[in-house]
């Protein structure tokens, strides 16, 4: 049974004043809530087990799901009403709700996209522990991958901060950033290593066998921190979609273009 987690617990501060009275998951685009759009789209690809985490105006989401007969059979709630746990902590808290034998598709509720989820499911084979959907687009923070698309680290191109469990990535003798070609060239002694820069989409596939590694993490943490601290001992890969189209509907101005985006994308 295909399963997914929809991150819907955020405060939605960039969508105020709408989110002063409702969770962002229930904000409508084209007359349909963001939560409904996400569930319905994934359901078209055969997903029938959903976990939705809630925090901000959590009861509204709980009631919304309970009022839909199909949702009430497919959707389980991971309640973070007492404390917002961020993406990693939210996934960790929900671990018991998933089938251990099937990857978990993770999707932010405020993202619209053109992903073929049958194709993306095929990218997560048994040997991968996680697959992150990435693209080449301008951003301030990039994930770093080797030529086999295995995760090596992270870089903030504004501050120059490097994060990685690999010392040769974190502490190179020199580093040359080529943003135009999405490369980071590192020198360690006489060895030159080229890493590839990709922007994370917020969509990823997660193997439940990674859950035990989360036990040493606090209750609250971002999922990217988990990936960056464990990628040297796990098999975390990036998957590039060249024609990827995403719209973050987390800001008021993005609502104005969302309907047009849906017309040409979904």
Predicted regions and their residues:
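Conserved beta-strand termini and adjacent loop/short-helix elements that scaffold enzyme active sites
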Residues: 55, 78-80, 133, 239-242
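Conserved N-terminal catalytic core of the sugar/cofactor nucleotidyltransferase
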Residues: 2-6, 28, 32-108, 119, ...
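Active-site metal-binding loops of divalent metal-dependent hydrolases
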Residues: 11, 109-111
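A short, conserved acidic/glycine-rich loop-to-beta-strand motif
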Residues: 127-136, 141
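Conserved beta-strand segments of alpha/beta enzyme cores
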Residues: 25, 74-76, 235-237
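Catalytic-core segments of class I nucleotidyltransferases/pyrophosphorylases
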Residues: 103-105, 112, 118-125, 137-138, ...
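N-proximal low-complexity "stem/linker" segments adjacent to membrane-targeting elements
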Residues: 1-17, 26
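A generic "binding-loop/recognition-motif" signal
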Residues: 11, 22, 57, 81, ...
């Amino acid at each position: 049974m295909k399963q997914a987690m929809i991150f819907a617990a955020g405060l939605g501060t960039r969508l105020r004043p709408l989110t002063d009275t409702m969770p962002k998951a229930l904000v409508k685009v084209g007359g349909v809530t963001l939560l409904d759009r996400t569930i319905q789209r994934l359901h078209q690809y055969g997903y029938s087990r959903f976990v939705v985490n809630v925090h901000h105006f959590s009861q509204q989401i709980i009631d919304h799901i309970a009022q839909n007969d199909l949702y009430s059979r497919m959707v389980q709630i991971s309640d973070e009403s007492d404390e917002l746990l961020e993406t990693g902590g939210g996934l960790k808290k929900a671990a018991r709700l998933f089938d251990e034998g099937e990857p978990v598709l993770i999707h932010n509720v405020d993202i619209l996209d053109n992903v073929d989820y049958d194709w993306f499911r095929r990218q997560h084979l048994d040997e991968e522990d996680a697959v992150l959907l990435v693209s080449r687009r301008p951003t301030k923070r990039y994930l770093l991958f080797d030529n086999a698309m295995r995760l090596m680290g992270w870089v903030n191109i504004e501050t120059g901060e490097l994060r990685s469990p690999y010392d040769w990535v974190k502490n190179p003798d020199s580093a040359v950033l080529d943003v135009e070609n999405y490369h980071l060239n590192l020198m360690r002694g006489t060895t030159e290593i080229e890493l590839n820069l990709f922007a994370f989409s917020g969509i990823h596939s997660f193997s439940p066998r990674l859950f035990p590694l989360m036990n040493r993490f606090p209750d609250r943490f971002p999922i990217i921190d988990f990936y960056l601290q464990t990628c040297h001992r796990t098999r975390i890969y990036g998957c590039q979609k060249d024609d990827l189209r995403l719209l973050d509907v987390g800001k008021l101005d993005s609502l104005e273009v969302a309907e047009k985006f849906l017309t040409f994308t979904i």
